[in-house]
Amino acid sequence: MRYTGKVVGGLIGLALGPLGAVVGVLLGHQVDEHLDKQDASLPPPEELTAISERFFRATFRVMGYLAKADGRVSEQEISAARAVMAELRLDSARVQQAIECFTAGKQPGFDLAGELAALARACAGRPDLVRVFAEIQVRAALSGNNLDGPVRPLMNRVASRLGVSPFEMAQIEAVLRIRGGSFRHASAGAEPRISDAEKLAQAYKVLEAAPGDADQDIVKAYRRQLSRHHPDKLKANGLPESMIEHAKQRTQQIIEAYELIRQRRGI
């Protein structure tokens, strides 16, 4: 039997108080049961390794391509790419690979269509992996102040080829802008001062829910988001080990958002 979900859920929940720990363990248990049922259908280790490598290389190649979309790569965009590598806690060998991939993506002859087609094949049946890929690209663009101009429509086209709609991309951007969604902001640890009403509105965005939703719909939205970003599930589907930290941060943000809404509603 798997216990990682319960442990992760409980530890994160403890930061929210005793009740948060209980809720975290219960939901973690549900995710663990779901993952146990999936184990029999998981691809063999060598296939997961291939998926992981494809995902890693595509992440930084496409990041380099998007950084060059306006004709040049600024120092800010280079710093943003390095911030991605730092937050993902890559070792020196992986950093060098990431730099090589980023540089390859900047080249005039880079085959974006081929890269995306290969990634789409690797992630077939794994929409949560594709969403993590989109989130990382948006966060990098936010870090480099590079999401406006030609980058946004180009990023939407990239996402579309992977099955992510412009509406979903807008949702991702809205969520990542909460509490400063860039990699540089996350590493700096500073948070903007916002009102309680704004915090609550942001919490609904994190869950992709609305204030008018019924309590049971809020709980369903919470569980859906928690399952989508669960580190164990993503890792089992081929997410590189180096990118699990991103999933953990999103999971904590989801739990904090639900706890705020739960307290306000008295769920």
Model-derived regions: residue spans:
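Small-residue-enriched hydrophobic alpha-helices in membranes
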Residues: 1-65, 75-229, 233-267
